Amino acid sequence: MMMGMKFFSFYVVLLLVAASSGMRINGQSVSCLNQLAPCLNYLNGTKEVPQVCCNPLKSVIRNNPECLCRMISNRWSSQAERAGIDVNDAQMLPARCGEHVNPIACLTRSRGGSTNSDRSSSIGNTFSQSYWMTTLAIAATVLSYCHHIIS
């Protein structure tokens, strides 16, 4: 029961942060983040990967690899570090769930035969999604900090 309240509170805070930022959120990025929410404790320093994290992560790897590309970008990595997320642990997460992810594929996807307008649109979407990931990381860190104070 207590765990359910924590997750409910977590989602309420995320929605408030997203609404207050005025940013555009597309369905794909929200879906991706919702699927990876069970991994947040691990990304905030818990050394054991929760079992409930691996299946959603495997689904994202197979069905939405662009999500992982956004999360391993230099911009997201530096912002995640500032928010207290161990980026090395985040990068090791797929392997700890028994999955292999090739980060070179992210470069191949981004350099595919797209036009300049496609690229500029992609850059705008990537910025928006990176901003959302940073907001998520900060919200998770604040919640974790508040939980430690209350406990």
UniProtKB/Swiss-Prot annotation:
UniProt subcellular location: Cell membrane
Entries under SUPFAM superfamilies matching the protein: Bifunctional inhibitor/lipid-transfer protein/seed storage 2S albumin (SSF47699)
GPI-anchor amidated serine: lipidated positions: 120
Propeptide boundaries: 121-151
Tissue: Expressed in vascular tissues of all organs. Expressed in seedlings, preferentially in hypocotyls and roots. Also observed in siliques.
Glycan attachment sites: 44
Keyword Glycoprotein: yes
Endpoints of the signal sequence: 1-22
Source species, domain of life: Eukaryota
Keywords, alphabetical: Cell membrane, Disulfide bond, Glycoprotein, GPI-anchor, Lipid-binding, Lipoprotein, Membrane, Signal, Transport
GO CC annotation: plasma membrane; side of membrane
Molecular function in Gene Ontology: lipid binding
Disulfide bridge partners, by residue number: 32-69, 39-53, 54-97, 67-106
Record carries keyword Transport: yes
Bilayer topology annotation: Lipid-anchor; GPI-anchor
Membership in a protein family: Belongs to the plant LTP family.
Job of this protein: Lipid transfer protein that promotes the number of phloem (pro)cambial and pericycle cells.
Protein name: Non-specific lipid transfer protein GPI-anchored 30
Source organism of the structure: Arabidopsis thaliana
